[in-house]
Design a protein with these regions (language model features):
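Functional-site microenvironments in short loops/helix caps that host divalent-cation chemistry
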Residues: 4-170, 174, 178
Length: 182
């Protein structure tokens, strides 16, 4: 099966039909200012295809004697993703360990909205750069908020029924029954 290699560059337009003049829609995928931002608009199949491509690319550039020791790239399982997101903190609510979403200065510790429709409160109306917030104890950034990640396995049988006030229908998701980690 052929899988398109490029993300859905109209990912946000599906929900905001009349916002074609919004610079984010036009520039996010192509402008160098967004090089360190997360990839969005990618289906589960596209994420899997990228893993396959990345494995082949790496193996192609390795000497023959090292190829047997290399593992393939793949999506993490939900359990692996959660383990990485927690950063070694077993009982913590957030990857940074504390029960609070703001630091002592009142600044948000992740890219998420505190109230329905309040997208500016964390400093970013859409996504945030990959290193915009403090990393967890494993050195991973944005493991709470920002964008959703695809996983190989599902967390819950109902994980395909995800809704938010940004997108109530998810009609444009090409693989709605695949695991999605929020």
């Amino acid at each position: 099966e052929r899988v398109p290699i490029y993300p859905d560059t109209l990912a946000w337009v599906h929900d905001f039909t009349y916002n074609f003049n919004e610079p984010m829609f036009d520039k996010y995928f192509w402008h160098p200012a967004y090089d360190e931002y997360p990839v969005v608009g990618v289906s589960w199949k596209q994420a899997k295809a990228f893993c396959h491509w990345r494995t082949a690319y790496k193996l192609y550039h390795l000497p023959e004697e090292r190829r047997v020791f290399e593992t393939e790239y793949r999506l993490p399982t939900e359990a692996e993703w959660e383990w990485a997101a927690r950063g070694g903190r077993e009982l913590a609510m957030f990857p940074w360990g504390g029960p609070y979403s703001r630091n002592v200065k009142g600044c948000f510790l992740a890219n998420f909205k505190p109230l329905r429709g309040n997208y500016w409160a964390d400093g970013y109306i859409y996504t945030a750069p990959a290193d915009a917030y403090i990393e967890n104890d494993y050195g991973l950034y944005n493991m709470a908020g920002n964008v959703a990640e695809w996983t190989e396995t599902a967390f819950d049988p109902m994980s395909d029924i995800f809704a938010s006030d940004l997108n109530l229908s998810l009609i444009h998701i090409s693989e709605p029954t695949r695991p999605l980690r929020i």
